[in-house]
Amino acid sequence: IVGGRAAEPHSRPYMVSLQIRGNPGSHFCGGTLIMGWGRLGTREPLPXVLQELNVTVVTAGICFGDSGGPLICNGVAQGVFSFVR
């Protein structure tokens, strides 16, 4: 995340990290990414620190670039999207 800041531990309880039991740090992906860690590609390593930032909500035009992060409204996960028009 460009211009973000490190999130406080446990401040985002709806974010998850899927790992292989007995192999800490071995993140893997399934059919859907449900964590907003800013992955740029399937072969890129995951960052160790979740980041957050404030964004301006737009009501018209095209919004894209989230790449599968969760849609959170008032602290509740409402859905997962990758591209909205």
From Swiss-Prot:
Gene3D superfamilies assigned: Trypsin-like serine proteases (2.40.10.10)
Recorded GO MF terms: serine-type endopeptidase activity
InterPro entries xrefs: Peptidase_S1_Elastase_sf, Peptidase_S1_PA, Peptidase_S1_PA_chymotrypsin, Trypsin_dom, TRYPSIN_SER
Pfam families: Trypsin
Alphabetical keyword list: Hydrolase, Protease, Serine protease
PROSITE patterns the record matches: TRYPSIN_SER (PS00135)
Top EC class for this record: hydrolase
Keyword field contains Disulfide bond: no
Residue ranges occupied by any Peptidase S1 domain in the UniProt entry: 1-85
SUPFAM superfamilies assigned to the protein according to its UniProt record, in alphabetical order: Trypsin-like serine proteases
Source domain of life: Eukaryota
E.C. code: 3.4.21.-
Any one of the GO BP annotations: proteolysis
Active site positions: S67
Entry-linked PANTHER family: CHYMOTRYPSIN-LIKE ELASTASE FAMILY MEMBER, MYELOBLASTIN
UniProt record similarity statement: Belongs to the peptidase S1 family. Elastase subfamily.
Role this protein plays: May be involved in the degradation of connective tissue in chronic lung disease.
Protein name (record): Neutrophil elastase 2A
Lineage: Eukaryota, Metazoa, Chordata, Craniata, Vertebrata
